């Protein structure tokens, strides 16, 4: 018997908080077409993700993947840092 490989959901967003230990808050923005008016509207969602090495800083663009629940609100893990935030 061969088992089908399960696809893992991944999302890309911007880190808006890194104040927690080994956790980050990622803002995911998407554009959705309004069902009645047809206008494209920006919607956003904040997801908490696990950052094992505490590498992320505010402003970084990251990719996160869905995982098992790690806490009450955290069920995503950091896959990679796409782009570092510029230091001013």
Curated annotation (Swiss-Prot):
The record describes its quaternary structure and partners as: Part of the 30S ribosomal subunit.
Family, according to the entry, reads as follows: Belongs to the universal ribosomal protein uS17 family.
Known role: One of the primary rRNA binding proteins, it binds specifically to the 5'-end of 16S ribosomal RNA.
| Name of the protein this chain belongs to | Small ribosomal subunit protein uS17
Q: Name one GO molecular function term.
A: structural constituent of ribosome
Q: Name one GO cellular component term.
A: cytosolic small ribosomal subunit
Query: What's a Pfam family this protein contains?
Result: Ribosomal_S17
Q: Which UniProt keywords apply?
A: Ribonucleoprotein, Ribosomal protein, RNA-binding, rRNA-binding
| Organism of provenance | Saccharophagus degradans (strain 2-40 / ATCC 43961 / DSM 17024)
User: Which PANTHER family does this entry report, sorted A to Z?
Assistant: 40S RIBOSOMAL PROTEIN S11 FAMILY MEMBER, SMALL RIBOSOMAL SUBUNIT PROTEIN US17M
Q: Does the keyword RNA-binding apply?
A: yes
The record's section on SUPFAM superfamilies has: Nucleic acid-binding proteins
- Residue intervals passing through the bilayer: none
In this entry, which stretches build a coiled coil? none
**GO biological process terms on file:** translation
* Top-rank taxon, per record: Bacteria
Q: Aminoacyl-tRNA synthetase among the record's keywords? A: no
Instruction: Name the InterPro entries on file.
Output: NA-bd_OB-fold, Ribosomal_uS17, Ribosomal_uS17_bact/chlr, Ribosomal_uS17_CS
């Amino acid at each position: 018997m061969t088992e089908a490989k399960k696809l893992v959901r991944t999302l890309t967003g911007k880190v808006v908080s890194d104040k927690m230990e080994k956790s980050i808050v990622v803002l995911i923005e998407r554009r959705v077409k309004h069902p009645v008016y047809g206008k494209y509207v920006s919607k956003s969602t904040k997801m908490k993700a696990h950052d094992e090495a505490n590498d992320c800083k505010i402003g970084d663009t990251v990719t996160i993947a869905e995982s098992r629940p790690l806490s009450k609100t955290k069920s995503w893990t950091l896959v990679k840092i796409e782009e570092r935030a510029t230091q001013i």
